[in-house]
Amino acid sequence: MQWKLNYREPAKEWIESLPLGNGEIGAMVSGGTRQETIELNLDTLWSGSQKQSEPYPDLPDWNHIRKLVFESRYNEAEEYAKSHILRDWTAAYLPVGTVDVQMLTENGNNEITEYKRELSLNDALHTVHWIEGGVTYQKETFVSMSDNVLVMKISTDSDSEVKVHVSLRSQMPCVCRKSENMLVFEANAPVYAAPNYYQCEEPIRYKENSGIKFGIMLKPVLKSGTIEKNENGLTIRTSDNFYIILIGKTDFDGCDNIIEFMSDILKCAEYKGYKQLKQNHLETYHSFFDRLDLHMGESDDYFEKTDTIQQMKAFEKGENTSEFATLLFHYARYLMICSSKPGTQAANLQGIWNNQMRAPWSSNYTVNINTEMNYWMAESCNLGDCHTALFELIDRTVKKGKITAQKLYGLEGWVSHHNIDIWGNSDPVGKYAQDGSPCQYALWPMSSAWLCRHMWEHYCYTLDGDFLKDRAYPVIREAVRFYLGYLTEYDGYLVTCPSTSPENCFLDRKGEKHSVTFASTMDISILKELFATYLQICKILKVDVLEKETEFALKKLPPFKIGHDGQLQEWYRDYRETDIHHRHVSHLYGLYPGNVIKETDQELKKACEISLNRRGSQGTGWCMVWKASLWARLKNGEKAFELLKNQVNLTHTTEVDMSGGGIYPNLFCAHPPFQIDGNFGFAAAISEMLLQSQNNDIELLPAIPEQWKRGQIKGIKARGGYTVDFSWKNGKVYYIKISALKEGNVIVRYNGQISRFFFKEGQNKVCLQKTGRK
């Protein structure tokens, strides 16, 4: 099956352009005919530097702020936190620049017909096709997964001369030169880029010989013809097909001479030639994309007959829901490969695609949900090696997080808060906030524990003992060490204080709005899971460092509580939310993505269901797919599907809207504005609806909606080291094949029955095969 996005006109704005990438180079291609723009990104182009931005003040008086909280003097606690604990903003992810490709036709008044642009998800290729003046034109563009260059081939079916002008531009001051039929520019990123919501006199600040150094090198490769240098770029004249090679590089990794580095890469790419570059790219990309295949629905030629906008509108009406949901699933896999290929940086708020110097929320790593949601799909969707980009970020954050723990808390271990950046900055931000309430998002020292969950998940899916011992264990151990020190006694329990439920606020008994309290349900859920995970690791690795202390602390954490409406309480006390429909459903972490609330916890599951119904079925793009996964965990496929359907709401707005979530014409998730987490979360929700696994127990179709009557999936992963293929019709599974990494027993639940199987290491086994299910 060929999965593609296809359109009948060029992009008019960024949210209509189509994304290409290889984890390091990102490109948004407009698909223009006479005027093409390719907006570029490099995964390591950020503001700031490795150096600490500001010195730490004296250690805050944590006993004082805890006293204020326990005495319900919340306003005073928040004021103290803002003035003594919060610090400067993180660095910002930045755009590199733009390639302009102009077709200089002799008669610009010719009618353009049979226009089509496509993004092949199977091949990671962008193509544009049109006819003008009796000549057929085609542009084929890819960002090589193997040779680390962007390549665009321009071809026609005519022997007539083609005249094309190519130029580069950037929003940052740069030095541009033309040499040896090439365009080269160099620049330095700003040392400071303020968030777009922070107003100041100098939001973008440069410092001579400071900031990340970066460059772009572009070269047309011709069989025949001429390349003319001019003030604005290069003008190409040729009667043959030709292609353009582009390479970008920063000195983030310590590269001493980025120009020499790019020149070597470009020469190597030119030597290989277009055919070899494309073949190498396809082989590498297919090694990721072809691991898994999902097909749902009845129509095999649906995507050939209709364009993407038509498909989206049909889905909104409840038509062809299986096919379009499957397309969005594969699009998420495509975006993961393109933005988080092993060896590159972790996908940020916008993956690797950003065209603004002051992007929404600095396009950083927001780790109170968004970054984590990016990777919920990674393991189950057979892209566990793409997950490793996040682990590299975690390793850098651990180093800074140890300093934060020591200087800000006076504790051992490591900690991070709701924002981090490429440098691993782990401090709570918001010191200079102008909204008056930064604590509701900033005073949350729990992301380090949540990030640990991802390392444990990687082990659960891969059973990689070396990874657990050498990589995950030290990180998780030091996080546990911090939280053991951070917990404090209250009411016979060990609680977090101060504590928030990310970005949400509550009303106290006087009806006043606050965010800072103690023992939020999310905090406690995360710590219950972290401590239980650490104890499991101790048993697996036969180590006992902090084991007794962790066992004691786990038992002393407060229990979950059920509130006034039967809902799972969001805070230790039964406060009312200021916004009952708030986008964050943080108190349900223990249900999903966590596994603290078990299948057998019927009372708590009912409380979670009530909480979800109270929150409603609308919200931001990422919020709706989180709720879909929560409903899937509750085995309610119809509710999960309702949320996915609500998320497919075509929008063009890029203004912040906390309840207007949807998707853009290029299928990017709209918060709005664009955030890529909703794309990845959509795939995670579908994965959870099709297969759930815990402790060598696999359930197939646990939350399948009525609309998805027929389908098959190959290559989906389950915890315990299993790879599963299965097919279904009318909600009933009729074929199952499982392969196992390690020897052991597994329970498989399907069609209301339970089967048990034993596997030898590396064994493949057909567990169910029924005929007559065509």
Per-segment meaning from a language model:
Residues M1-C439, E457-Y459, R477-V480, L494, ...:
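Aromatic-residue-lined binding/catalytic grooves and analogous aromatic/hydrophobic interfacial grooves
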Residues D290, I337, G485-T488, Q536, ...:
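Charged/polar positions within long, soluble alpha-helices
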Residues E319, W361-Y365, A378, D435-M446, ...:
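Alpha-helix capping and helix-loop boundary segments enriched in small/acidic/polar residues
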Residues A346-N364, E489-E503, L667, L700-G711:
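Short, surface-exposed recognition loops and adjoining beta-strand edges that mediate ligand/DNA contacts
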Residues I369-E379, P445-W456, M522-A532, S586-N595, ...:
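Well-ordered alpha-helical segments within folded domains of soluble proteins
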Residues W456-T462, F467, A472, A479-E489, ...:
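Non-catalytic carbohydrate-binding regions of carbohydrate-active enzymes
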Residues E478-I537:
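Acidic/histidine-rich catalytic neighborhood
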